[in-house]
Each structure stands twice: as C-alpha cells, then as structure tokens.
Amino acid sequence: MSEDEAQFHGNYDDYVTYLKRRIRQLELQVRMLEADKERLERELSRLRSEMSRLRQPPAFAGSVIEVLDDDRAIVQNYNGPRFVVRIAPWIDKSKLRPGTRVALDQRTMAIIEILPASKDPAVLGFEVVERPNVTYNDIGGLKKQLQELREAIELPLKHPELFEEVGIDPPKGVLLYGPPGCGKTLMAKAIAHEVNATFIRVVGSELVRKYIGEGARLVHELFELAKEKAPTIIFIDEIDAIGAKRLDETTGGEREVNRTLMQLLAEMDGFDPRGNVKVIAATNRPDILDPALLRPGRFDRLIEVPLPDFEGRLEILKVHTRRMKLRGVDLRLIAELTEGASGADLKAIATEAGMFAIRERRTYVTQEDFLKAIDKVLGNEKKIIQQIMSHEVIYG
C-alpha cells in the first residue's frame, strides 16, 4: 500500500477527490511544459534563421542603368564595368528605374534587393525635428507677420481645397528678412508645429562646398529628404550665403556658390506648389540677394520681421515672464526702457533678471533685477558697438 493510500485508508471518497485534484495539477503542469516547449522551438527556429542569414555571403552594391525585357537589366557596379543581369522574381520591377540602387548577388550578379537612395551624411546631419514644440503662444509682437506666414504656408498644407476653389496656386516659398534675433526661426518652427510637419533647418553656409558639384548635390538630396518626410517645411537660415547676386567676374569658389544657387532655383521650380514641401528662408541682408530668387514662382511672399515696437516688446516680455514669479515689476516700464531691443535681447534680459534673483537667494524677481539686467544686456551691447566704431576710426 502506498503512502497516499495509507493516508486515506478507509476513506475512499476523500482519496478519489485527492486523486482528481492531483490529476488536474499534473495536467496543468503538462500544458505549461508544452507551452514552454513551443516557445523554445520558436526561439530555436528564429536563431537558426538568424544564423542562416548571417552566413549568407555579402552582396555587391550597384545602380540600374537600364531595365530590359525578359526580366533583365543593365547594372553597373560602383567604379566597375556594366553587366546584363537577371532580376529576381520577388523584385517589384515597377520600382526599378535608371539610377536605382540595388544589391547584386555575389556569384550571379542578379538583382536580389532594392536599396534605399543614398544620401550624403551632411544631409542626414541637418537638424530634422519631427514636430517642433514651439507654438504661436511662444511668439509675441508679430501678429501681422504670423498671419501672412500662415496664409502662405499653413493654409496650403491644411486646406489646399481653398486654393483650388479660387483657382490660384499658393506661394512656393516665403522669405523672412529683418534684423537678427527678431523671431524668424521661431515663426518657422511654430508653423511646422501647427501643421504637424517635419522641420528641416539648414544654414546657408552648410550648402557651400569645396569641390565642384558637391553643393548642388546637397541641395538636391535635401529636397529628396524633404519629399520622403512630407509634409515638410525646409527652413534655410542665412540664405544670403548662397543667394547673393551673381557677378560677371568670379573666382572658383564663387562659381561653385553660383552652381549651388542655380540648383536651388531648379529645385524650387521643379516641385508642385500644392505639394507637401514648403520652403521658408531668412536673411539679414535682403539687399544683396539675387533677383532670380525673389521673382514670382520661387519666394513669392516677402515678409519683413522688424524690431518690435512698444506693444510688441510688451507682448514678448509677457511671453518670457509668464512662468516667473514677479513682485512689483512694471512690464510697461521695462518695455519703455528697452527701445531698440530685439526679441532675443528681451529674452536675455528676462533670463539675466532671474539670475540676479538666484544670486540673492530669492525665488521671485523684482523690478531692480530687471533694471540691472537691462543695463547688463543692452549696456554691454552699446559699449561693444562703441569700441568697434572707435577701432575702425583709429585703424581705418
């Protein structure tokens, strides 16, 4: 007699109940073990597949020259000869065009995969923000300029049917011009946030390259990247670096800049004004820009972003102080004392006022902190300008 039987000797009902419970426990353990077995078999299959993939020989990279009939194509291995090769049956032939990058089998040179288009690392290094966190509430004193920018950029992206009903094409690009620090970049980011668009910021000097054709290629790949991530807003800051007036007498470097400019003009002529790519450019020197940039069909709308007036300075101060604890601060007086200051200057003044409060171990900012900040930010600026002017007078 087993121990279980001895335990329930003479009480068969309890023994039967115990056996049923034990059977259920064993069945549950069996199901758990079967589930573990299936999981481990799937993991084994995945690892075997991964091992098989890693053991595959490397493929050559090439480009399609011409697509032929009978599932064949002419391809060229980079820096190598041309081959007439077969196209693998799983390749979508409609996607094969001259210039398409493909992977070629090492042994048969057959096309076995379509590769993504190549991009210069400099293009991939441009500042790409999927959706900026700047909103219209972060901008003060630029209501008129924002309205004009929204009409040219936001409306075509969000409500293209309005332009179709009226029968006009929206502007392809907008040029923002004015002194530095007045909010041109902020306006572009706010528009990108509102339309939920990708924001690509490029400085004009980044498109200037040493060797012939490199700058033009960068511009082309920049617009290709924008089309892939559409809807996209391309913001070209300091466009005067590549968009200055072309002269008859040029050096080698200036000729390369002119080639880059011509590529930019060609790209802006080549995309649909009702498409999902918009261009915003900014400059502090609109007087030196090439007239070809400013003609209708490229930068159709020119928006001046001037230094803020009294009401504009007051709005900007309210924006930058809305999270600050103020005690006895008259923002209207601060706005009067900062005549000629840009939006960036006003932000610096608010930051310096907060730093003065921290220096005094306070959690609130007073009027005196702002007065010290004004003297520090604007006073130093005036002193620097005076020093530069006196230096020019002395040394000519």
From Swiss-Prot:
Q: Which organism is it from?
A: Pyrococcus furiosus (strain ATCC 43587 / DSM 3638 / JCM 8422 / Vc1)
Which key words are in the record?
ATP-binding, Chaperone, Coiled coil, Cytoplasm, Nucleotide-binding, Proteasome
Subunit structure as annotated in this protein's UniProt entry:
Homohexamer. The hexameric complex has a two-ring architecture resembling a top hat that caps the 20S proteasome core at one or both ends. Upon ATP-binding, the C-terminus of PAN interacts with the alpha-rings of the proteasome core by binding to the intersubunit pockets.
Q: Where in the cell is it found?
A: Cytoplasm
Please, one GO biological process term?
proteasomal protein catabolic process
Q: A single Pfam family, by name?
A: Prot_ATP_ID_OB_C
Q: What is this protein called?
A: Proteasome-activating nucleotidase
Q: Which GO terms describe its cellular component?
A: cytoplasm; proteasome-activating nucleotidase complex
| Family from the record | Belongs to the AAA ATPase family.
Read off the InterPro entries from this record: 26S_Proteasome_ATPase, AAA+_ATPase, AAA_lid_3, ATPase_AAA_core, ATPase_AAA_CS, NA-bd_OB-fold, Nucleotidase_PAN, P-loop_NTPase
